[in-house]
A protein has these predicted regions:
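C-terminal regions of mature proteins
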Residues: 2-24, 28-31, 38-40, 234-236, ...
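Short, Gly/Pro- and small/polar-rich lid/capping loops
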Residues: 33-59, 65, 290-293
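Non-catalytic, conformational "gating/processing" segments within enzyme and secreted inhibitor domains
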Residues: 217-255
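Acidic/histidine-enriched segments that form metal/cofactor-coordinating
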Residues: 2, 12-41, 76, 106, ...
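Divalent metal-coordination and catalytic microenvironments
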Residues: 60, 77, 95, 135, ...
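His/Glu-based metal-binding/catalytic segments typifying zinc-dependent metallopeptidases
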Residues: 64-69, 76-81, 261-364, 372, ...
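A common structural junction motif
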Residues: 153-160, 253-262, 408-419, 529-533
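M16/MPP (pitrilysin/insulinase) zinc-metallopeptidase core fold and M16-derived inactive scaffolds
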Residues: 50, 69, 74-142, 181, ...
């Protein structure tokens, strides 16, 4: 994620150039009649990285700041935790830790905490992801100390009462039931589950329902003791001078106890929080062989028949994914551009006609096949792996046709000749769209804050937006074709040494209008994909 800076300076620079050209067009006689005006040397505009600073406290907490002026400031705490680090004992705990944020602490009751949060007049939240727990607040400049204090309290000094645990477990149970009724929410989770086989990135982000009775205060405290450590913590400030940022971080996080880092034994991470939490997931994501996770619209699969589930929509959902590149890879820019180039969306757009009309999936799929309800590319990037592919919704009975259409669109990215091959015009358009999207996203203080904190957490530094835009702009058609061939051909080699085979998640709907409908087996799906030259056998 990036933020646009210097556009006003660029405008001034263009204006100066035009003025100079105008003065140069005057005749020599006119210039000789007037004394030349005094000129002032204008310093070049500051790079945003000139305003970025990173310090490390004695206990290992990293403090990052970006002193961009504005009426609002942001403060965030990013902890290297999340579902990818969970083992069997801690499975699903990240979901509950997320929900327990901003409850009672050793200094405030839950009512006092809520009142303090409301007094900020901004936005405060906790978000759990696969690789990070993110506590963030955007508020008025004058309220930054209070916001930092509240974040520190909920991170370092939560009470976690029995009543709070009971309430959040009940809420989590309701969330789980509701999300499983929404294919657009649960199927991306199942794509990760199928691709990474219940390890690291395949661990469920949503707490499994069967785990809820086993999670209590002791389990949550074990999770916090294992991962809430200073060396795994980044405190980021947006719109705050670095000296003030260091002072606030020292005041509220400087006393976090520095302990020995998690020890690694083979491919596992040892948790020292208790005997029950003896090991965590492997630190390297791996895709183990080709996999398919069929999701029938039935309460239980019966080999002799099916029972329709009325809670599910009457559409077939299909996800086709391949292992992508890590977020630190130089090829991430090409893969993000390919994702933008494919684009896509729904057959009905609330944004009005023409929304996304120049993307490949919109023009070649949604505009061509009336039985396709939705078709969109996706790209998930993580520290050591990723997933790239297409998701689609179509009418019942069109599964085979939908799979062929998706494979055709992906294969077209790898061709060097023919009408499906990548063209310079569409590549340029995709690069411009990607840069525009990235720059506009960072107009949000919260996005800017998360960008700073996560980059320091992942890269150890803030990558300048100018550097990212330059890398996007310098991409060629050959670069995109090469990356597409590597990813879609199963040639990506990451730390986990994946198989290169495709991952398919299918939620097939039985077509009641015909008796000849036959569901595809995994062998049929796999062979169909290989026939298009995708994946590695």
């Amino acid at each position: 994620m990036f933020r646009a800076h210097g556009s006003r300076s660029l405008g001034r620079g263009l204006a100066s150039s035009l003025a100079a050209a105008s003065r140069g067009s005057q005749t020599c006689t006119a210039r000789s009649q007037f004394r030349a005006l005094a000129s002032v040397s204008v310093p070049p505009p500051k790079e945003t990285t000139d305003l970025d600073q990173i310090s490390t406290l004695p206990n290992g907490v990293r403090v990052a700041s970006e002193a961009l002026p504005g009426s609002f400031s942001g403060v965030g705490v990013y902890i290297e935790a999340g579902s990818r680090f969970e083992n069997g004992y801690l499975s699903g705990v990240s979901h509950l830790v997320d929900r327990l944020a901003f409850k009672s602490t050793t200094k405030r009751s839950v009512e006092d905490m809520q009142e303090a949060v409301e007094s900020l007049g901004g936005n405060i939240q906790c978000v759990s992801s696969r690789e990070s727990m993110m506590y963030q607040a955007a508020t008025f400049n004058s309220a930054v100390p209070l916001a930092t204090e509240l974040l520190a309290e909920t991170i370092r000094h939560p009470r976690i009462t029995d009543e709070e645990m009971g309430e959040e477990l009940a809420t989590a149970q309701y969330e789980i039931e509701e999300i499983w009724k929404k294919p657009e929410l649960i199927i991306p989770e199942l794509v990760h589950l199928a691709a990474f086989k219940d390890n690291t990135l395949g661990n469920p982000l949503l707490c499994p329902a069967e785990r809820l009775p086993e999670i209590n205060k002791q389990v949550v405290r074990g999770y916090r003791e294992a991962f809430y450590r200073p060396e795994r913590t980044v405190v980021a400030f947006a719109g705050v001078p670095h000296q003030q940022a260091v002072e606030l971080a020292t005041e509220f996080f400087g006393e976090m106890e520095a302990r020995s880092p998690l020890s690694r034994s083979g491919s596992e991470t040892s948790l020292e929080s208790g005997s029950s939490a003896s090991s965590a997931s492997s630190s390297k994501s791996s895709l183990f062989g080709s996999s398919v996770l069929p999701l029938w619209n039935d309460p239980a699969l019966n080999p002799t028949g099916t029972v329709p589930n009325p809670m599910q929509p009457n559409l077939t959902s299909l996800h086709l994914a391949f292992e992508g590149v890590p977020i630190a890879s130089e090829d991430i820019y090409a893969l993000a551009t390919l994702n933008t180039l494919l684009g896509g969306g729904g057959s009905f757009s609330a944004g009005g006609p023409g929304k996304g009309m120049y993307s490949r999936l919109y023009t070649n799929v949604l505009n061509q096949y009336g039985w396709v309800e939705q078709c969109q590319a996706f790209n998930h990037s993580y520290t050591d792996s990723g997933l790239f592919g297409i998701q689609a919704l179509c009418l019942p009975g069109k599964t085979q046709a939908m799979l062929d259409v998706m494979c055709q669109q992906l294969r077209g990215l790898t061709l060097s000749t023919g009408f499906q091959a990548l063209g310079q015009q569409e590549v340029t358009r995709a690069k411009n769209q990607l840069r525009s999207s990235l720059l506009m996203n960072l107009e949000s203080r919260m996005v800017e804050l998360e960008d700073l904190g996560r980059q320091v957490q992942v890269h150890g530094r803030k990558i300048p937006v100018q550097e990212m835009c330059h890398k996007i702009e310098s991409l060629t058609v050959d670069d995109l074709r090469r990356v597409a061939s590597d990813v879609l051909g199963g040639g990506v080699v990451n730390a986990g040494k994946g198989s290169g085979s495709p991952t398919v998640v299918l939620q097939d709907v039985f077509d009641h209008t015909t008796t000849s409908t036959k569901r595809m087996t995994w062998e049929e799906i796999q062979e169909r994909i290989y026939r298009w030259g995708l994946g590695r056998r």
